[in-house]
């Protein structure tokens, strides 16, 4: 590895003629967009929506239809309504697109185009940012940029969030995190970019707090830079803190009713998160301001420690309950029958129990990238050291979080793509001179790790003895709005359906539902589970108490857990074809994917 820090070799690479990233990037974007859009082309973009996408569309429709900006209740969920933990940030561009297009192509056409255009635009933004980060970290090596984009379009865990129909918020969070990494990596050169980075951090958290640990790692890296470099970066760090504090303090009253800021809202942007974000930004401003007047390492360490103690003390004194898991308030019944089986919230330990063959695809590439990035950090130019520390800290936070919740692996794969490409360019400049860098990336891409894990499934099954296979369980499930389309024939009513059917029914019909896959919907989810587990007399009473009009199950993928737990419960009886006298079976669905009963009064 004698060419570890061959700056002359890297300079030659910048001037070497070859593939132009500006030409290849649109080609790769279009290829990826078409590839991940094939299911939508075959089945329709509305059927490509996940449950979260469907619920986001419902929320946007309600807002366009006149629901208040500050009112995030879903009045057709667990009537008379349940609170959602999403903000209006993502609703704004979606509603703007729909309202812009509606006069020209009608509501359905406007929604269809929006479902296609929005994720495609975000994918384009993500690829541009990935290329820019790779350029920044590799000192401008063109092949590193191309390699990073190739890795990104092969980032299997992330691509699902950019398919047509993906409008929930995960794709926007990934894009904002990439932009934050890019801007913060240039913090030593520009106070303006530093301030913009602080704004993007607040905006990401205003959308949702899934990226909070990664953003905290970035803020910690910025604070560490100030401690390390002192006066030479105090202006830029102060600008980052100002952007962070000012934007969060402006976003809070713009998105939330002021009285809600005093409430311990721990699963979304609210008082607790505002305290951490604004307090952290102000702390950075204070540290930078003191350092500009009296710059010593000891004083910087002291002010940093004091700021952390004050901020931590304020948080624990006001919102100590937020230290618990955001799912701590979920009823144990709901946790057992639903939350523990949600794929995107699975921990690494659960994945090893249920689908061990998928672990490599979700975790292999980011973990490998950590090793290469650490080696690149050791051999990099001292002037570039901060950007490598920043990348490693961000990636480490994402990997750690993905061990707890699998869905964060998508962001980890996207952030790892430019870091891995730049690592190879730094470690082996001669490798980056031709196509070998791209070929190596293809061999070590997230998709390759996923393929390796799936191909080794028989051996992995022998070692881990998985309890179930999620893919097999989901193969015949009712997961699209067309599966519930037959319910539009029925008069508007209150529907007791399985959890994953809830958002689909809300999106495609005027009915109200009790259950949906959201942790705040405790009451409705518990009611549905108790009904399905109840013996016939108790089930009759629950239906009467809740004034239910229809009962719906997915007949092609019955809830086997409910059947096993309560073989004489309503779910088991309906699954066996029995119809209690208080229900009337309706023959609505020609595909027979769902079964519907009307409740007799």
Q: Where are the regions a protein language model picked out?
A:
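Extracytoplasmic
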Residues: 3-8, 445-601
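Active-site lumenal/periplasmic loops and adjacent helix-entry segments of GT-C-fold
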Residues: 38-138, 142-176, 204, 209
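Membrane-embedded helix bundles of polyisoprenyl
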Residues: 28-33, 118-137, 143-188, 193-228, ...
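Hydrophobic/aromatic-rich transmembrane helices and adjacent perimembrane loops
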Residues: 364-369, 404-442
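Signature aromatic-anchored transmembrane alpha helix within multi-pass, membrane-resident enzymes
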Residues: 304-308, 426-459
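Membrane-interface helix-loop-helix junctions at transmembrane boundaries of multi-pass membrane enzymes
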Residues: 230-238, 294-305, 320, 367-393
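Juxtamembrane membrane-water interface segments that cap and precede transmembrane helices
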Residues: 102-108, 255-268, 328-364
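Start-transfer (signal-anchor) and selected internal transmembrane alpha helices
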Residues: 1-41, 146, 289-307
């Amino acid at each position: 590895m004698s060419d570890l820090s061959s700056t002359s070799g890297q300079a030659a690479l910048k001037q070497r003629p070859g593939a132009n990233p500006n030409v290849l990037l649109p080609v790769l974007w279009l290829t990826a967009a078409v590839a991940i859009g094939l299911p939508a082309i075959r089945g329709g973009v509305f059927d490509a929506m996940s449950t979260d996408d469907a619920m986001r569309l419902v929320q946007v429709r309600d807002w366009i239809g006149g629901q208040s900006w500050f009112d995030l209740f879903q009045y057709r969920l667990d009537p008379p309504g349940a609170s959602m933990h999403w903000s209006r940030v993502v609703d704004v561009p979606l509603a703007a697109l729909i309202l812009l297009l509606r006069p020209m192509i009608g509501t359905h056409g406007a929604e269809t185009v929006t479902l296609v255009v929005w994720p495609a635009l975000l994918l384009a933004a993500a690829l541009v940012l990935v290329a820019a980060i790779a350029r920044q970290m590799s000192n401008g090596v063109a092949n590193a940029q191309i390699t990073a984009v190739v890795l990104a379009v092969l980032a299997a865990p992330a691509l699902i969030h950019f398919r047509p129909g993906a409008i929930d918020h995960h794709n926007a969070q990934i894009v904002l995190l990439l932009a934050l990494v890019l801007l913060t990596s240039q913090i030593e050169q520009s106070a303006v970019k530093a301030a913009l980075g602080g704004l993007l951090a607040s905006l990401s958290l205003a959308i949702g707090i899934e990226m909070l640990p990664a953003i905290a790692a970035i803020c910690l890296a910025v604070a560490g830079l100030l401690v390390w470099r002192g006066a030479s970066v105090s202006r830029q760090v102060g600008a980052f803190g100002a952007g962070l504090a000012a934007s969060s303090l402006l976003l809070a009253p713009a998105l939330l009713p002021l009285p809600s800021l005093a409430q311990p809202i721990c699963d979304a942007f609210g008082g607790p998160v505002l305290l951490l974000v604004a307090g952290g930004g102000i702390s950075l401003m204070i540290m930078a301001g003191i350092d500009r007047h009296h710059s010593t390492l000891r004083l910087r360490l002291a002010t940093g420690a004091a700021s952390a103690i004050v901020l931590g003390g304020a948080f624990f004194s006001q919102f100590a309950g937020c230290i618990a898991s955001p799912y701590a308030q979920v009823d144990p019944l709901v946790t057992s029958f639903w939350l523990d089986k949600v794929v995107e919230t699975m921990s690494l330990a659960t994945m090893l129990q249920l689908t061990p063959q998928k672990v490599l695809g979700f975790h292999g590439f980011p973990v490998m990238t950590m090793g290469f990035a650490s080696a690149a950090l050791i051999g990099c130019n001292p002037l570039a050291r901060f950007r490598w520390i920043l990348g490693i800290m961000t990636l480490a936070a994402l990997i750690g979080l993905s061990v707890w919740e699998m869905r964060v692996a998508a962001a980890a794969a996207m952030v790892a793509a430019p870091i891995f490409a730049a690592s190879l360019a730094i470690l082996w400049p001669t490798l980056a001179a031709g196509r070998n860098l791209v070929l190596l990336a293809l061999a070590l891409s997230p998709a390759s790790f996923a393929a390796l894990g799936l191909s080794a499934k028989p051996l992995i099954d022998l070692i881990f003895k998985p309890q179930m296979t999620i893919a097999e369980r989901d193969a015949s499930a009712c997961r699209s709005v067309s599966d519930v389309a037959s319910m539009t024939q029925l008069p508007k009513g209150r529907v007791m359906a399985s959890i994953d059917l809830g958002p689909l029914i809300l999106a495609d019909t005027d009915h109200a539902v009790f259950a949906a896959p959201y942790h705040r919907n405790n009451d409705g989810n518990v009611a549905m589970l108790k009904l399905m587990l109840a013996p016939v007399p108790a089930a009759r009473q629950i239906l009467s108490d809740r004034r239910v009009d229809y009962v719906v199950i997915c007949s092609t993928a019955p809830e086997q857990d409910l059947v096993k737990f309560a073989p004489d419960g309503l779910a088991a009886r309906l699954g066996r074809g029995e119809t209690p006298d208080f229900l009337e079976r309706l023959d609505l669905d020609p595909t027979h994917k769902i079964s519907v009963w009307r409740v007799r009064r």
